From Swiss-Prot:
Protein name: Iroquois-class homeodomain protein irx-3
Location relative to the cell: Nucleus
DNA-binding region of this protein: 108-170
Gene Ontology CC: axon; cytoplasm; nucleus
Biased composition (Basic and acidic residues): 223-237
GO BP annotation list: brain development; cell development; dorsal/ventral pattern formation; kidney development; maintenance of kidney identity; mesoderm development; metanephros development; negative regulation of neuron differentiation
Gene: irx3
Length: 448
């Protein structure tokens, strides 16, 4: 027997070609003396089984016994009833005409069928009778499923599709979720199904506009509250600070200075001096900056001194003293140190002083430590070694720090002789005011 599809060549048969189908004794007498059957069966089975098979002369009914060890999976080992030429084990077996589907057979009357016109006619009749409340209860669904031979899932899906179709065609004759409390408690799953249907309609088809409008109406109070809070915060900021729209750092600095002066000095002549209509001769840079400032709102005239600080007004919070009337002597130095910390004036005058010189005195192009005419009336001796700050910052820093340590008593005396200032950065109008500002800055640098 050969297996050309498997790549094996012809194998010599164990029996002669003129074998008869019933020649049991002949085949046994022919194969037994030669020992061929015993050798084959000993390779397949053990020695006792091979001897028993040879004794019973079953060799004629085992045609492929030599090939069984090679292909044990091709078929059963004993082909006792059929002749070898009828069907081989490697051939395909006939299959049944159909396979059973699920737990029901095709002829079973209890098998659920698809929705047809006959089955849906019952559902349509029930829907027409209950147009005002097209939500069947669980018992009604079971009854309709038995009548139409459909499952509960099919019945529920059909009613959901029917309600959605009627909503789409604007033929709704019922109020959504119109069930009573008793039915709702008994059949809570139906309400969940209705909510799921409404969510699908809103998300997928955007049909149920009434639910959307009701949700928007429910959301309106929250939005009104948020909008009111936004307008309130904006109005408070506009009343307290009229310069929130200024983006230039110099303008913000001037805004903080003006606010501090208005808090500490409740006198109209200071505001007149800071207004854009003032006739007092002023430097060009200060005139330009004061022209940019809008007129202060009238609410600030009666503003109390100890008002509540705002979170968004950091400069005002930093420059406002705790009790300006009780401590007039320390107010100027505290404000000076706070403003210096706010505007990055740190105790290293050599390396970090260049960034400050371009803020309040950019139009005059003055370097506070390099201009001799600015400090000529003070008689301070430690400004001369610090003339090379821009080119050699580290060396100048070390020299200036040693000089400031040695000259600390002189700066303290200067601070005592200077009258108390409201802020460290007032608009400069006279030369003497410039001397006072420079002295305050140098004293703050040396003391820190």
């Amino acid at each position: 027997m050969s297996f050309p599809q498997l790549g094996y060549q012809y194998i010599r048969p164990l029996y002669p070609s003129d074998r008869q189908s019933v020649g049991v004794t002949r085949s046994g007498t022919e194969l037994s003396p030669a020992g061929t059957l015993s050798n084959v069966l000993s390779s397949v089975y053990g020695a006792p089984y091979a001897a028993a098979a040879a004794a019973q002369a079953y060799g004629a009914f085992l045609p492929y016994s030599a090939e069984l060890p090679i292909f044990p999976q091709l078929g059963s080992q004993y082909d006792m009833k059929d002749s070898p030429g009828v069907q081989h084990a490697a051939f395909s077996h006939p299959h049944p005409a159909f396979y059973p589907y699920g737990q029901y057979q095709f002829g079973d009357p209890s098998r659920p069928k698809n929705a047809t016109r006959e089955s849906t006619s019952t559902l349509k009749a029930w829907l027409n009778e209950h147009r005002k409340n097209p939500y069947p209860t669980k018992g009604e669904k079971i009854m309709l499923a038995i009548i139409t031979k459909m499952t509960l899932t099919q019945v529920s899906t059909w009613f959901a599709n029917a309600r959605r179709r009627l909503k789409k065609e604007n033929k709704m004759t019922w109020a959504p979720r119109s069930r009573t409390d008793e039915e709702g408690n008994a059949y809570g799953s139906d309400h969940e199904e209705d909510k799921h249907e409404d969510e699908e309609e809103i998300d997928l088809e955007n049909i149920d506009t009434e639910d959307i409008e009701s949700k928007e109406d429910l959301d309106d109070p929250d939005t009104d509250i948020h909008s009111d809070s936004k307008t309130d915060t904006r109005s408070d900021s506009e009343v307290s600070d009229g310069f929130e729209d200024l983006n230039v750092p110099e303008d913000r600095l001037l805004k903080s200075v003006v606010g501090q002066r208005q808090l500490l000095n409740e006198e109209p002549q200071d505001k007149c001096a800071l207004s854009s209509d003032a006739k007092v001769p002023q430097p060009a840079c200060e005139q330009i900056k004061l022209n940019r400032l809008p007129p202060s709102p009238p609410q600030e005239n009666n503003m109390p001194v100890a008002h509540k600080p705002k979170i968004w007004s950091l400069a005002e919070t930093a420059t406002t003293p705790d009790n300006p009337r009780n401590s007039p002597n320390t107010g100027g130095s505290v404000n000076t140190q706070n403003l210096i910390a706010q505007h990055r004036l740190i105790a290293s005058p050599g390396s970090r002083f260049q960034g400050w010189t371009g803020r309040a005195f950019s139009a005059q192009q003055l370097s506070l430590l390099n201009s001799a005419h600015f400090l000529q009336g003070l008689g301070v001796s430690h400004t001369a070694p610090c003339s090379g700050n821009a080119s050699f910052p580290k060396a100048a820093e070390s020299k200036c720090s040693t000089n400031s340590l040695t000259d600390r008593p002189s700066t303290v005396d200067i601070e005592k002789t200077i009258p108390v200032l409201n802020t460290a950065f007032q608009p400069v109008q006279r030369r003497s005011q410039n001397h006072l500002d420079a002295a305050m800055i140098l004293s703050a640098l040396s003391s820190s």
